[in-house]
């Protein structure tokens, strides 16, 4: 009998969470319609948010959000363990700004591990809420966001390829987020999100071994491909404290190229376009309206020019 791997266990966990979500969906859609008096109130539902999608709701002015994520990307015979933390601040009731640094370590099966824990790239973000959700009038939360990548992670001149945790690019992401709450026939709330994002990356100077597949002695540049993503999410409020969540994800990446010279010879490396579809079931638990935890797994089957990956994740969400 084949030994069960971590990826097998994570896939089994993801399948179990998806099955729980589907069974709950079937139950709630088959329930009898409730009267207005028995509908769950918006204040009675506490949320941390799903695993992948961003919230369109801004923080109230003067409030802060701290949300550390801990996750392990298991793909292509490597495990990359990350700690990624959001620090967000409500500059006004409609404008939220923040920063999200990343630290990581890679364990390579059959290869060299990272030389230690390293800093990855850092993201600056600003988000402006255009409308505030009003379910009675059919108005969703709607926001525009700008994310700026700071290339704080090492990406070239690598002694070990497992030390590459950055991209070297000042990439800019433009996004639109929406969020809405719906009352299901069971009377419980279902919150949905829909995100669209486009990432544009400028050219990057590259020397020696790098995350772009170049070797020691290379001198040239890389052009990361632009990325487009679509994400929709569903959260069902089981009780005030417990929430089932599910993200559905599509990512498209344009070809990434590296051009330059190695040992006086011209070098051209191209990855080709890529497409990936994934899902991320999760379970939320909220101790209060401002403090909760989230556990789940993000699964990407192998796609067009993409490897299969399984990423178990845990997050703590605190608003003050």
Residue ranges of each PLM-predicted region?
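Transmembrane beta-barrel strands of outer-membrane/channel proteins
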Residues: 68-72, 99-103, 144-150, 192-200, ...
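Outer-membrane beta-barrel translocator domains and adjoining extracellular loop/strand segments
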Residues: 77-82, 107-114, 154-161, 203-213, ...
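Detector for outer-membrane/organellar transmembrane beta-barrel domains
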Residues: 163, 167-264
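Short loop/turn motifs that connect adjacent beta-strands in outer-membrane beta-barrel proteins
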Residues: 54-62, 77, 94, 132-141, ...
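Outer membrane beta-barrel transmembrane domains
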Residues: 217-320
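Residues on the lipid-exposed face of transmembrane beta-strands in outer-membrane beta-barrel proteins
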Residues: 66, 85-89, 124-128, 146, ...
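Residues that define the transmembrane beta-barrel architecture of outer-membrane proteins
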Residues: 79-85, 117-124, 140, 166-174, ...
